[in-house]
């Protein structure tokens, strides 16, 4: 019986399949992997793997540019961003481009520029990807030793890690630069309903910044997702940028300690599994951030959070009925609790009714009406501004409750707009992707550990039908 595939396929993934570095790299015979196994064919071909990664980056940046221009072309300035299904323009708006007071879009040209810049850079990346995939050297070790590597080379791997950390740190500091010097960021908490402003008084106190990391992740505490002011967000990026850059320098200058050499599996597939775990964690954190946080993800662009829409409904009816003569401080609801206002278990005055569960919501349209002990009755009677009424009515009818077939809105709200909020899309997609990336982490970690332990022999193929079929050609 003729064996049509490489038995090396079943041994430790770092084996060079033909004993030399001059690999074909495109067929099953030379790599032990079939065409559909994708980059697995390129495990030991650093030049070709570079091409695959650069081309992948080109595809990502092309999508960003094309989708950006698509959103600009379809954008209607009279409607809020979140009602138009936009997921990229809200991010640009949050960075302060083209935005005036109250989150109003006053200039779409910066969005057009962003799209064009991404398209142009995607062309450069695409050319580089095709060049390295088809023309450039198969391996970089000989011609460009700085860019070459062997997966088992622990020192080189931590050097590459260090370079990545420095780039991430520089990215964090770019946001800081935009906030302080280059026009500022959109701050939803700016007086009068939000505005773009330079963030000058940034929080650098380590007890404040790292205090977020030590908080409980549960209600009322909310871990890092509870950040509610731009000063802390920008200060956090300062700390993160500096830590990443110094960590990167450390990893470039040092070799892994003995405990690290023993603790980790040092192979390409192991690094893939570590990366997938990290991205999975980031996906889950992003899911919580976009769902609950209305400072980093301002409701003017992403739509209200769930608790915010619920509290807005209670507020809107309080405003309406107060105008009709209701005494909102003492009116009783059907359960004997306050109809409009009630006390929380700890004594604060909160909105009554079903929205009591969201009593710890903080939102820029509501906070001015609070006093030292929760909502302030005299402010509710005298100080409500028209912009607060308008915004609350808008949020009440745009709850982020929509199924993916677009049946949206609160079932009990007659005026709900039938749409799916970008908050729903972004949090759901990041949760689902975070989950699948975690499964990918488990899969590749298991394979990498088995290969390192020497018992990864693959699936037993002795009885596979393909072994006794005639080749197609």
Curated annotation (Swiss-Prot):
<feature type="transmembrane region" description="Helical">
    <location>
        <begin position="255"/>
        <end position="275"/>
    </location>
</feature>
<keyword id="KW-0602">Photosynthesis</keyword>
<dbReference type="InterPro" id="IPR044900">
    <property type="entry name" value="PSII_PsbC_sf"/>
</dbReference>
<keyword id="KW-0007">Acetylation</keyword>
<dbReference type="GO" id="GO:0009772">
    <property type="term" value="P:photosynthetic electron transport in photosystem II"/>
</dbReference>
<feature type="transmembrane region" description="Helical">
    <location>
        <begin position="447"/>
        <end position="471"/>
    </location>
</feature>
<keyword id="KW-1133">Transmembrane helix</keyword>
<feature type="binding site">
    <location>
        <position position="367"/>
    </location>
    <ligand>
        <name>[CaMn4O5] cluster</name>
    </ligand>
</feature>
<dbReference type="InterPro" id="IPR000932">
    <property type="entry name" value="PS_antenna-like"/>
</dbReference>
<keyword id="KW-0148">Chlorophyll</keyword>
<dbReference type="Pfam" id="PF00421">
    <property type="entry name" value="PSII"/>
</dbReference>
<comment type="subunit">
    <text>PSII is composed of 1 copy each of membrane proteins PsbA, PsbB, PsbC, PsbD, PsbE, PsbF, PsbH, PsbI, PsbJ, PsbK, PsbL, PsbM, PsbT, PsbX, PsbY, PsbZ, Psb30/Ycf12, at least 3 peripheral proteins of the oxygen-evolving complex and a large number of cofactors. It forms dimeric complexes.</text>
</comment>
<keyword id="KW-0157">Chromophore</keyword>
<dbReference type="GO" id="GO:0009535">
    <property type="term" value="C:chloroplast thylakoid membrane"/>
</dbReference>
<keyword id="KW-0812">Transmembrane</keyword>
<dbReference type="GO" id="GO:0046872">
    <property type="term" value="F:metal ion binding"/>
</dbReference>
<keyword id="KW-0604">Photosystem II</keyword>
<keyword id="KW-0464">Manganese</keyword>
<keyword id="KW-0150">Chloroplast</keyword>
<dbReference type="GO" id="GO:0009523">
    <property type="term" value="C:photosystem II"/>
</dbReference>
<feature type="transmembrane region" description="Helical">
    <location>
        <begin position="69"/>
        <end position="93"/>
    </location>
</feature>
<feature type="propeptide">
    <location>
        <begin position="1"/>
        <end position="14"/>
    </location>
</feature>
<feature type="modified residue" description="Phosphothreonine">
    <location>
        <position position="15"/>
    </location>
</feature>
<keyword id="KW-0597">Phosphoprotein</keyword>
<dbReference type="InterPro" id="IPR005869">
    <property type="entry name" value="PSII_PsbC"/>
</dbReference>
<comment type="function">
    <text>One of the components of the core complex of photosystem II (PSII). It binds chlorophyll and helps catalyze the primary light-induced photochemical processes of PSII. PSII is a light-driven water:plastoquinone oxidoreductase, using light energy to abstract electrons from H(2)O, generating O(2) and a proton gradient subsequently used for ATP formation.</text>
</comment>
<feature type="transmembrane region" description="Helical">
    <location>
        <begin position="178"/>
        <end position="200"/>
    </location>
</feature>
<keyword id="KW-0793">Thylakoid</keyword>
<keyword id="KW-0479">Metal-binding</keyword>
<protein>
    <recommendedName>
        <fullName>Photosystem II CP43 reaction center protein</fullName>
    </recommendedName>
</protein>
<feature type="transmembrane region" description="Helical">
    <location>
        <begin position="134"/>
        <end position="155"/>
    </location>
</feature>
<dbReference type="InterPro" id="IPR036001">
    <property type="entry name" value="PS_II_antenna-like_sf"/>
</dbReference>
<keyword id="KW-0934">Plastid</keyword>
<dbReference type="GO" id="GO:0045156">
    <property type="term" value="F:electron transporter, transferring electrons within the cyclic electron transport pathway of photosynthesis activity"/>
</dbReference>
<comment type="similarity">
    <text>Belongs to the PsbB/PsbC family. PsbC subfamily.</text>
</comment>
<feature type="transmembrane region" description="Helical">
    <location>
        <begin position="291"/>
        <end position="312"/>
    </location>
</feature>
<feature type="modified residue" description="N-acetylthreonine">
    <location>
        <position position="15"/>
    </location>
</feature>
<keyword id="KW-0472">Membrane</keyword>
<dbReference type="GO" id="GO:0016168">
    <property type="term" value="F:chlorophyll binding"/>
</dbReference>
């Amino acid at each position: 019986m003729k064996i049509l595939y490489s038995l090396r396929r079943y041994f430790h993934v770092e084996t060079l399949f033909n004993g030399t570095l001059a690999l074909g790299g495109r067929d099953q015979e030379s790599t032990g992997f079939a065409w559909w196994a994708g980059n697995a064919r390129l495990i030991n071909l650093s030049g070709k793997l570079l091409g695959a990664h650069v081309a992948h980056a080109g595809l990502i940046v092309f999508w960003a540019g094309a989708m950006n221009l698509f959103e600009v072309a379809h954008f209607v300035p009279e409607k809020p961003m979140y009602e138009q299904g936009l997921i990229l323009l809200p991010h640009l708006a949050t960075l302060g481009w083209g935005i005036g007071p109250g989150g109003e879009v006053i200039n779409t040209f910066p969005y057009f520029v962003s799209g064009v810049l991404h398209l142009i850079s995607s062309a450069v990346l695409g050319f580089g990807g095709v060049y390295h995939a088809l023309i450039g050297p198969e391996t970089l070790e000989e011609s460009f030793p700085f860019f070459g590597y062997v997966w088992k080379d622990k020192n080189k791997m931590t050097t590459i890690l260090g370079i990545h950390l420095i780039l991430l740190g520089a990215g964090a500091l770019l946001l800081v630069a935009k906030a302080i010097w280059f026009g500022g960021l959109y701050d939803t908490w700016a007086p009068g309903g939000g505005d773009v402003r330079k963030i000058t008084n940034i929080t650098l106190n380590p007890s404040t910044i790292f205090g977020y990391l030590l908080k409980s992740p549960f209600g009322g505490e909310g871990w890092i997702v509870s950040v509610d002011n731009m000063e802390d967000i920008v200060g956090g990026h300062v700390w993160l940028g500096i830590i990443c850059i110094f960590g990167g320098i450390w990893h470039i200058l040092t070799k892994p300690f003995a405990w690290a050499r023993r603790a980790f599996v040092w192979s390409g597939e192991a690094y893939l599994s570590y990366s997938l775990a990290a991205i999975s964690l980031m996906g889950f954190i992003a899911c919580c951030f976009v769902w609950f946080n209305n400072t980093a993800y301002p409701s003017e662009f992403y739509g209200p959070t769930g608790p915010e829409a619920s509290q807005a409904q209670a507020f809107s009816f309080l405003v309406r009925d107060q105008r009709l003569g209701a005494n909102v401080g003492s009116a009783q609801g059907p359960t004997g609790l306050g109809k409009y206002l009630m006390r929380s278990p700890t004594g604060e005055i909160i909105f009554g009714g079903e929205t009591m569960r969201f009593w710890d919501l903080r939102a820029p349209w509501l906070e001015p009406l609070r006093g030292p002990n929760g909502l302030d009755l005299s402010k509710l009677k005298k100080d409500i501004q028209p912009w607060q009424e308008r915004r609350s009515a808008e949020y009440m009818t745009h709850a982020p409750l929509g199924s993916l077939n677009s049946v949206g809105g609160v079932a009990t709200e007659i005026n709900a707009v039938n749409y799916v909020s970008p908050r729903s899309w972004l949090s759901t997609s990041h949760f689902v992707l975070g989950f699948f990336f975690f499964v990918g982490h488990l899969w590749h970690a298991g394979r990498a550990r088995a290969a390192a332990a020497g018992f990864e022999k693959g699936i037993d193929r002795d009885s596979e039908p393909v072994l006794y079929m005639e080749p197609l050609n």
